[in-house]
Amino acid sequence: QILKTLTRQNAFVTCLNDGQTYRFHHMMKECAFRAFRTLDDSRQAFYYERYGAWYEKHGAYIHALSAYRRNQNFAAILRVVQKDAGILLASLKPEEVLEVLNRCPVSVLKEYPLAILVLMRCMFNWKNIPKMLELKELLLASIREHPKLSEEERGNLLGECDLIQSFLMYNDISRMSQFHRSASEKMTRPAISIRSDGGWTFGSPSVLMMFHRKSGDLDKELEEMNQCMPHYYKITNGHGQGAETIMSAEAHFMRGNFVDAHIALEKAYTQIQGNGQESIALCCDFLAQRLSICMDIKMRNTFEERRKELLQGHNTTWVNIFDSTCAYYYAVTGQTERIPTLFGAHMLSTVNFLAPGRPMMEMIENQVYLAQGEYSKVIGRSESILAMSQALHYDLVALHVQIQLLAANWKLGKTEQALDLLRRSLSQAFPDGILMPFVENYPYIEELLKGSFFGINENFLFRITRMGKEWEMRCDQLKKEEAYPPVFKVLSDRELEITELMAKHMSNKEIAQSLFLSEGTVKQYINQIYSKLQIPGDVRVKRKYLLEMMEGKS
């Protein structure tokens, strides 16, 4: 009743559409918080405890952690960490988590072995391996010393420890699987420290970029994924399900086998339907976007619809991954004005990306710089991105960056450097038949590809060139389709050109002078435009209606 009265009388409080949730303006929240701080410490502590419990109950774990931190309620903090399983925790700054961890008494930590497992994985995500290993020793001590643990649960915890340790072998599929099989032998239940609805890709929009480790080994890596993932699914209740399928689809795409890529993509979409594997779904979306440039496929959602859907999930990681896929799509198709702000305005430094996913984000930002004509920036950044990629054995990411680097060198007139990088990139890609990074950058490297490259298969070069030309034509067609309302597809290029000039309120005479045509010819074109678009009425009404249709395109 108090909230209803406040809502009626105060513009700073609004009731949301669900009729149950209220939003307070930040100014009112600040005033309320200042008033709250005038309460004595015990009263504040009482309410912080209530805040924490309410947020915890409703799954708002970041807010719950914030409330419990103010009370130094470490047991509650660890309970929330265990429930969150590192999903929302990953969005916090590592130093914030470490600061709480360092203040938490060891005796309390030992009471929450599952929270320790979650924190171990977080430390891997943040590249803090010494702390990860320190927590492992604490976990083993906790398992040894815990008086109430059954032998079965000790086995489960030791199995989960093997599971978390597998990340130390990250992207070496067979070595990771050895830990998964060891964990499977010890465990009688699915892992608790990894929730099946949590992210699997560390923020990467591509599984293939994560696991293609070495030039010439792609087929071997695909087979290893097929053999190893079932063991991982068994102990994680299907976490990351569909990863091997989308990786196979991506490999087909990289080799220019678009029909096979599309079939595998649809299999992956079917495999993950309704099982909460959003990170795998985003990898599917990324491939679907890239595939839609190369062949006629029906997208499941428009970019705007998909982003709105993700925003409703209140997980910024998913939104950032999707923005990265859109940024790449718009960069390679030359639609720089449509690149999401995070990438278009180069704001990656404001986001806490997990270490294994950062090279992919940096590579995509490099592609954006290339599309924006910032060639010196591309050259200046590429060395550090290549170093990151090589440290993580990201062979495909490194290939993308090398091609971006050679394109930038070529654009700045550094021909020898560009040719050397092209030779290296072709030699790296040929053993696995990887074509698409060259094709997607064909407008930059078309002239360079006309040279002769000793030791490089001629058919491989021919396929890149042929597919590059087709890809460039499809990009031009896509840009035209996306720049106008769907009904404008019936217009020819010349008619679209005249339509654009009409939108600038140019007269028939001005249009004729601009295009070196006679006024009579322009008038004929305009009548054809009206006829094709089925616009009725007199001349003035027709033109007004056409302009309204043009404005509706945005």
Where are these regions (language model features)?
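Internal alpha-solenoid helical repeat scaffolds
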Residues: 108-283
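C-terminal boundary/linker of central alpha/beta nucleotide-binding cores
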Residues: 1-35, 46
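Linker/hinge segments immediately adjacent to helix-turn-helix/homeobox DNA-binding domains
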Residues: 338, 364-384, 388-395, 404-493, ...
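Amphipathic alpha-helical segments of tetratricopeptide repeats
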Residues: 65, 85, 102-106, 137-149, ...
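Short coil/turn connectors between adjacent alpha-helices in alpha-solenoid helical repeat scaffolds
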Residues: 82-92, 124-134, 166-181, 208-223, ...
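Alpha-solenoid helical repeat architecture
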Residues: 62-63, 73-74, 112, 149-159, ...
